[in-house]
Amino acid sequence: MADEQLQLPPEQISVLRKAFDAFDREKSGSISTNMVEEILRLMGQPFNRRTLEELIDEVDADKSGRLEFDEFVTLAAKFIIEEDSEAMEKELREAFRLYDKEGNGYIPTSCLREILRELDEQLTSDELDMMIEEIDADGSGTVDFDEFMEMMTG
């Protein structure tokens, strides 16, 4: 359960703590599962009601109808992390499209070399060669979006 928490930055956990505390009116250390939807809505966090219900079921291990803070963070993190990764993929797709001038779904490794050099001017030619060799795993001399995405997200 704590895996998702590790992926959230401390400031995000702090925001979740404030929201949780505001809805934990009795200061019992837990909130009703009914309040989760309201908290996500107030935070401007998009969610699908059915997915939310399934996650509440999964996270509320003791089926108490209440979530402790850790359970709440685990649940909220699933929405936050998914949204962040979707946004990142969209941005990377746009960046890839800029370099894929012909629109054929790949960019030449020479273009990739320019991108890498812009990202880190300190790279030597040998380092660039090694990186490109690793990224262009199939040795095609081109990099498709999946290879590009893997490079950018590690």
UniProtKB/Swiss-Prot annotation:
| Binding-site list for Ca(2+) 2 | 136, 138, 140, 142, 147
Pfam families cross-referenced by the UniProt entry: EF-hand_7
List of residues binding Ca(2+) 1: 60, 62, 64, 66, 71
The residues covered by the EF-hand domain are 11-46, 47-82, 87-122, 123-154
Q: Which domain of life is it from?
A: Eukaryota
Keywords recorded for this protein, A-Z: Allergen, Calcium, Metal-binding, Muscle protein, Repeat
GO molecular function terms noted in the UniProt entry: calcium ion binding
User: GO cellular component terms?
Assistant: myosin II complex
Residues annotated as transmembrane: none
PANTHER family in UniProt: CALMODULIN LIKE 3 (PTHR23048:SF0), MYOSIN LIGHT CHAIN 1, 3 (PTHR23048)
Q: Which family does it belong to?
A: Belongs to the troponin C family.
Known role: Troponin is the central regulatory protein of striated muscle contraction. It consists of three components: Troponin-I (Tn-I) which is the inhibitor of actomyosin ATPase, Troponin-T (Tn-T) which contains the binding site for tropomyosin and Troponin-C (Tn-C). The binding of calcium to Tn-C abolishes the inhibitory action of Tn on actin filaments.
Return the protein name: Troponin C, isoallergen Bla g 6.0301
Q: What is the lineage of its organism?
A: Eukaryota, Metazoa, Ecdysozoa, Arthropoda, Hexapoda
